Amino acid sequence: MSDAIRPQPGILDIALYEGGKSHVAGIQNALKLSSNENPFGPSPKAKEAFLRSVHTLHRYPSTDHAGLRHAIAEVHGLDPARVICGVGSDEIITFLCQAYAGPHTDVVFTEHGFLMYRISALAVGANPVEVPERERTTDVDAILAACTPHTRLVFLANPNNPTGTMIGQADLARLAAGLPAQAILVLDGAYAEYVPGYDAGLALIEERGNVVMTRTFSKIYGLGGLRVGWGYGPKAIIDVLNRIRGPFNLSTTQLETAEAAVRDQDHVARCRADNARWRIWLAEALAEIGVPSDTSMANFILARFSDTEEAEACDLHLQTQGLIVRRVAGYKLPHCLRITIGDEASCRRVAHAIGQFKRMR
């Protein structure tokens, strides 16, 4: 490439995102517990909608996403005009950075927060500001102290990935109220459906004009392979995001499958209940053999080891047993492994394998 051809500032500072591993060399049918996927997959109704969509593949999709937006609004009690849909919640995050951040502005997030916050900030030339957490949990005071007149966006995953920890409504309200007037609080609710009774910040959005929420169909809805997400916020902000959204960013298959998925809340409830049961079981089983974790409110636990060497050695042992979990050194947690909550057999299998590893030490 010619020296005269250069990308915008910040682009070359982006480290390529690496998703959870899917395969282990020499191991057939390894069990993937590295990407926080729903072990039960999508709703049967969503699968039926997916198959029906093949009959209209020659047609362009809707540009306004009306069917999906209204379904989301009906289920959550929202104004459909204030719902925006994207290619995963990642795209909504990207839209927010494109619209509100840029050179000489700051984008704030916590030290163990989702990697896409940093990537999206750098992509628009903004300055990523990483704020320390307190025992792997969001520290509201630290976030507020990091805000300046340059702050434009504050991203907060609640529950957080990869820690699984979360803060309550009172702290969220205090954070929103304490931000500079020009800053938007973005509540990433990718794992919100795993928390009974949690509105992921919806009430806060109605009370304030500086809060936006993002959600995804990749987790409890089991549609990670389709890439569908959505956001909700003040009408003025959603209008801005729609101005930079591509007119055909979602296919008919994505739209109709996601609509069927969100309407099947019985499937969501079953998945949430099963996840809660086995998340508690796995955390307790690992704690008994000397592998603690913080209380997780998501569909994974963050297992803590004595040091980086032990975590990496355990990961290698699990791979020999056909089990794939996620190293999280990229999240500044090199002594930890993130383990997706699978079905009963998967949880028992991973607990047995880690117990076997600890006995060999």
From Swiss-Prot:
SUPFAM superfamilies: PLP-dependent transferases (SSF53383). Its cofactor is pyridoxal 5'-phosphate. Belongs to the class-II pyridoxal-phosphate-dependent aminotransferase family. Histidinol-phosphate aminotransferase subfamily. The lineage of its organism: Bacteria, Pseudomonadati, Pseudomonadota, Alphaproteobacteria, Rhodobacterales. This is Histidinol-phosphate aminotransferase. GO terms for molecular function: histidinol-phosphate transaminase activity; pyridoxal phosphate binding. Pathway: Amino-acid biosynthesis; L-histidine biosynthesis; L-histidine from 5-phospho-alpha-D-ribose 1-diphosphate: step 7/9. Keywords: Amino-acid biosynthesis, Aminotransferase, Histidine biosynthesis, Pyridoxal phosphate, Transferase.
